[in-house]
Amino acid sequence: MTKTNTLLPEVKRDVLKNVLKTLENKFYKPELLGATWQDAVSTHRGSIEDAPTTDAFESEVSNLLQTLKTSHLGFFHGDARRASSRAALSATYLLTDTGTHGQRWVFQDVHEGGAAATARIKPGDILLAVDGRDIAPPEHPVFPMGKTSELVVVGSDSAKRTVSVTVARPKGKKLQYVEPTLVIAKTPALNIGYLKVAMFPGMVGVDIANAMSAAIRDLGAIKGLIVDLRGNTGGGAGSLRLMSLLTDGKIPVGFAADKKWAEKDLSGLKGSFPRFDSIPEKSQFLWLLALRFLPTLITKSPVVLETEGLGAKPYHGRVVLLVNRHTASAAEMVTIFAKENHLATIVGEPTAGRLLSATSAKVGHGFRLALPTGAYYTWNGTALEGSPIEPDYLEEFAWEERRDGVDAQLAKAIELLNV
């Protein structure tokens, strides 16, 4: 299916009906589907059913979903081969007044191993155009998967340059993204380790958990640790390993509760919820995990994440987390866990405030709806959706300094650990 194909009227009506039914059955917060939502559906129905192309249909349905003002909502066709900068290039950006070039998107996080980094795009570079089209806010750039795009950017020398960015095809249909280098470890200063985690792929996260543990072992007997979660937009339960590396014991982290549990006294019930407290070392043991949690799948009980009890580390008590406006979902789970349990000092910008459990569902004719199915609560009862986590030390992204190679946020982290 091409993006310019027209859809039969009955197809559009059927897909919209399925979208609304799926939201009614699975959406985590049913109170948001009341009169205001029904009015929005009535208002948008005409433009959705009159959408002339597949691309326009996706856009109109997405406009309707945006009225719910909730993260983790999305609508796309399974054959779609275009994605955002974050998903396609492994890079994030922010709106900035650049002076000479006006209001533009400026790259903030550029993950190693991603398409943007391979094309030598750097944090602080200004995006001017994509494939011959001028791109400026509020329009967001999108990139075709499995193809090469030509980007015009401005770097630290203030000169325009054209770079070719080749985006790999995604691994599956459910989530359109390309993995960057997931874990990077180094020693930026004497006795200080640095661990950057770009994302937490996988539902259980066996591979990412092993990679983080190996990186910590390779850092050796460090006396302080910087964990860089800037630009980490989340993932799965592999984040539990990172939390476990911040403390020696077993500490309850939190849980996600779907709409079935929304009206219940979770503070009184949470002690009875089953606990996920160990990531298997090998994927071949995942079936044992599935067997263990089979009753939970039947009862749909929330599952409490609990740290794995990995023992004392030489850097415990001297940890700094680097976060920014793009730190979201499972990465925010790590951040609030460290903050509430006084396991790390948080440096950088307020996080995204997007922390829900989510899934995607087929809604007919090749389309899928991504939607949040549960609210996440920390063990202390904090719900983060819509509430960014404030850093202990605010250090804003300074784009002009950053493109000159000065990372003030990292420098602040090193300063705190050297005290």
Predicted region positions:
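Low-complexity, Gly/Ser/Thr/Pro-rich intrinsically disordered linker/tail segments
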Residues: E390-V419
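Stable alpha-helical elements in mature extracytoplasmic
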Residues: V11-L16, L23, A40, H44, ...
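PDZ/PDZ-like domain segments forming the peptide/carboxylate-binding groove
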Residues: R82-P137, I208
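Conserved PDZ fold ligand-binding element
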Residues: V19, A116-P138, I226-D228, A338, ...
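Sec-exported extracytoplasmic/periplasmic mature domains
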Residues: L20-L32, S42-T53, S62-L73, I126-G132, ...
